[in-house]
Amino acid sequence: MSCHNCARRTLGLFIRSFANVEPTFAPKRTLIRNAQPSRLLHASTARAPYKSDQRDRAAPPTQKEADIEAIAENAENAEDDALPAKYERPAWQAHKAALKEKLNGEAWNPRKKLSPDTMEGIRHLHSTQPDKFTTPVLAQHFKVSPEAIRRILKSKWQPSDEEYEARMERWNKRGERIWTNLVEMGVKPPKKWREMGVGRARGGERPKWKSDRRNLVHVRDSASDSFVMDDGDIIPIVDGTGKARRAPDIPLTRRL
């Protein structure tokens, strides 16, 4: 019986070798990589979300938390308002910013300019008696803005001899040009400019400042607007005693 079983077993192994033929080399497998990870993952293998995702998905703050944030913000604003005065912007910086805004970023170029000698006199007056010759007083007397006086007093620049001569030459040319235009309008130039030839007539003609149009143009001087003098005080009338007396007031009806 054992021999029969052995023969049967041998025959079965022989038939199985022809039915189930396995290749000697295993076939090459193709690897497919997905661009995105599969969302159908098990709960145990799924990755944990990032902290940013957790913050984005966080619940909105409650009313209590909003009140706490508002109280903290009000406390910070109160601390900013309670800062000492030394942290505030200095006055000169505020003045500079306001002046820059007023000039629209342009350079300082006033229409009325004072001569170099006048500016030196302003500095001398302010240095000797600063309580008397203040910036408003000097600005009112010389008919310029307080900002111009402030800049003159602030300037410490001292020209050299060559720079001073060139500066005075430019100033004389400027004065000659201005007074030449005023002579054309009938204004008598000062003696300094007449000696320099301003308003001098040529060919035996009469100077224009001696014509009928003389002094028809109003020229402002250094006197204040409140300075008023009566006509009788300008040219006093002297009687036999040598004392000045006022001209009699004659009504207009009698003078006609």
UniProtKB/Swiss-Prot annotation:
Looking at the keywords, is Membrane present? no
Q: Where is the transit peptide?
A: 1-48
- Entry-linked InterPro entries: NGRN/Rrg9
Q: Which subcellular locations apply to this protein?
A: Mitochondrion
Cellular component aspect of the GO annotation: mitochondrion; nucleus
Pfam families in the record, alphabetically? Answer: Neugrin (PF06413)
The main location class comes to: mitochondrion
Where is the chain membrane-spanning?
none
Write out the entry's keywords from A to Z.
Mitochondrion, Transit peptide
Q: Does the keyword Mitochondrion apply?
A: yes
Please give the residue ranges the record annotates as the region Disordered.
Answer: 38-65
Its function, per the record, reads: Required for respiratory activity and maintenance and expression of the mitochondrial genome.
Its family? Belongs to the RRG9 family.
Please state what the protein is called.
Answer: Required for respiratory growth protein 9, mitochondrial
Q: Gene name on record?
A: RRG9
